From Swiss-Prot:
Keywords: Hydrolase, Metal-binding, Metalloprotease, Protease, Zinc. This is UPF0758 protein AHA_0160. PROSITE patterns: MPN, UPF0758. Belongs to the UPF0758 family. It holds the Pfam family UPF0758_N.
Length: 224
């Protein structure tokens, strides 16, 4: 049965307009994005099939182009459309943390860093630079690959902070495994960076480790 033949209060688009997006299932949200199903499957049924095939909504949204386009009911046009939607979401968060805005919401910071780092296939170490009123100066990606004491250089972080005249920073990196629990190396690197920046009176406000929908805060753990 086509979705058009469903009772109006069960149609995903009408439900979203009436209840808001938070009241819809993953399959219903995906169905609105897909708009149409395929032969024998409504858009919702196709969405359920795709979610089962990929394992989760996150896995589907983060799939590489070849795997995404190979799935029944998808293709290059849908992949391009999805990438545009995801990028607009990132830019929406970025505009809320744009240069000159005071950093007043810890949750906004988490959401922004999740959007920037969560789905990266390798580790990325980044820096959020702030002025003395905790207004955002710039977000900078610094190091890539497995992060340890040999790959993260406090001296480079000091140079970047001085270049942008930062008064404080927030450190962030992702764990591609999805497990956000900080390692011993993460804590050691943070201590080294904090000590190096303290020599020039720049505070480390937090170090956020980004996992699969989970963010661990060093500040909340009492480690800073």
């Amino acid at each position: 049965m086509s979705i058009k033949e469903w009772p109006e209060d069960e149609r995903p688009r009408e439900k979203l307009l009436r209840q808001g997006p938070g009241g819809l299932s993953d399959a219903e949200l995906l169905a609105i994005f897909l708009r149409t199903g395929v032969s024998g499957l409504s858009a919702v049924d196709l969405s359920r099939h795709l979610l089962q095939q990929f394992g989760s909504l996150r896995a589907l949204l983060g799939a590489e182009q070849r795997a995404f386009c190979a799935a029944h009911g998808l293709g290059p046009a849908k992949y391009a459309q999805l990438q545009a939607v995801l990028e607009m979401g990132k830019r929406h968060l970025a505009e809320q943390l744009q240069r000159g805005d005071p950093l007043t919401s810890p949750q906004l910071t988490r959401d922004y860093l999740q959007a920037q780092l969560r789905d990266r296939p390798r580790e990325v170490f980044a820096l959020l630079l702030l002025d003395n009123q905790h207004r955002v100066i710039q977000f900078v990606e610094l190091f890539y690959g497995t992060l340890d004491s040999a790959s993260v250089w406090p001296r480079e972080i000091v140079q970047i902070a001085l270049k942008h005249n930062a008064a404080a920073v927030i450190l962030a990196h992702n764990h591609p495994s999805g497990v956000a629990e900080p390692s011993r190396a993460d804590r050691q690197i943070t201590d080294r960076i904090t000590a190096a920046l303290a020599l020039i009176d720049i505070r480390v406000l937090d170090h956020l480790v980004i996992g699969d929908g989970i963010t661990v805060s060093f500040a909340e753990r009492g480690w800073l």
